[in-house]
């Protein structure tokens, strides 16, 4: 693993306990309680964002894998994008592991969701990265294995070019009978288009969601951190979807 230097960790922790960050928590809590979604503007300081973006670009240039497949457990919905696995990120980024391991981050998330927030026990799903960049690239409808996804956005296309988060909240996932078309048709489908530099928290285990297709070449680059609830740790997860993609 690449060394997550003490200055980086200290900067991350200091930002997450700063008055400015904490001042946003009541509004984030309200958004999450109403929508199972909360967008955190300026998730990290500019210097951290810029250095992490450079790390990601280098990793995508040298260690990424292109995927073009359908995932059976989510109704054979498509995945067309480029991926970075957790271990590639851990070995090539100083910041992303520090963010995932931050006790201040988990404490802030617990205030937002009003539950205990835990690191996921399955290491390959702790954090991953994807890049949509070709026309037709899409991260099709799916649920996550664990309760929460925290998605840090590094590049985002114009809203009229796709790349938006679309979701239907409060729907169960049965991998043997996912009923994706039924849930999407019944809706309501909520659309969000977060900006680069922001992060969003989604109750992804009970929210059917996708990243809408790109209509022309552009970039949507993100890192997804997964966090577990106490209930998650008592449940079995087969991890077939994550294994197929990363």
Each language-model region and where it sits:
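N-terminal auxiliary "cap/dimerization" subdomain that precedes the catalytic jelly-roll/cupin core
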Residues: 1-78, 98-103, 243-246
